[in-house]
Amino acid sequence: MFRVLNDDVYSPAEIQQQNPLAFGKASSLFTDNRSANDQCETGENVRESGQDHVKRPMNAFIVWSRERRRKVALENPKMQNSEISKQLGYEWKRLTDAEKRPFFEEAQRLLAVHRDKYPGYKYRPRRKRKRQQKLLPADSSKLCKQMHIETLQPFTYRDGCANTTGSRMESQLSLSQSVTITNSFFQNEHHSSWTNLGHNRVTLATQISADFPFYQSLQPELSCAYFQY
């Protein structure tokens, strides 16, 4: 079966000589596929998306605006469709009832034809599909907004601002340096005062111990009174 269908190896004449029945099946298979491809290309037996959709009958304004829209578009080729629609609505409101009457009559005639052609017609408006938006968590969304604002609105320095910023930075730097120097000075003074105080205490104790025999030679009541605390 696979040898029969392989056209690259065997020609149609060889296939017919080897197995005429298989050639008939293969040819019918090729013709069926070709007809199916033709149907796909021409759109036969394929249900189109708008095949079942029936248009609404035109009202008086649409009947009037069809021809008027073409004229306005030809007169103003650069005008957008939305602007043309606004102009047509304004012009339609300015028309009198006598001027609108022929278009209402034409709309009634088209409505009667539409009822005869589609007796069970009911207007069914198409529903608009709602797009699902994936929302980020609150914290991450706020962070993204902040990052977006920072990237879109960078801070630009001007000459005056740069000078002011530089002077502020220099003043802050000098202030921090002065505070550091003052702190180091107080620390050194505090350390030196404690060192001097300790040294004075040692000197005083040494001097008292050296002079102790002299105080003992004095009267006992004076020596005791001197060393009472």
UniProtKB/Swiss-Prot annotation:
A GO cellular component annotation in the UniProt record: nuclear speck
Single GO term (MF): calmodulin binding
GO-annotated biological processes: cell differentiation; male sex determination; sex differentiation
DNA repair among keywords: no
Subcellular location: Nucleus speckle; Cytoplasm; Nucleus
DNA-binding region: 54-122
Keywords of the record: Activator, Calmodulin-binding, Cytoplasm, Differentiation, DNA-binding, Nucleus, Repressor, Sexual differentiation, Transcription, Transcription regulation
Keyword Lipid biosynthesis: no
Main subcellular location of this protein, as a coarse class: nucleus
Sequence similarity: Belongs to the SRY family.
Summary of subunit composition and partner proteins: Interacts with CALM, EP300, HDAC3, KPNB1, ZNF208 isoform KRAB-O, PARP1, SLC9A3R2 and WT1. The interaction with EP300 modulates its DNA-binding activity. The interaction with KPNB1 is sensitive to dissociation by Ran in the GTP-bound form. Interaction with PARP1 impaired its DNA-binding activity.
Protein name as annotated: Sex-determining region Y protein
Organism of this sequence: Przewalskium albirostris (Thorold's deer)
Protein's gene: SRY
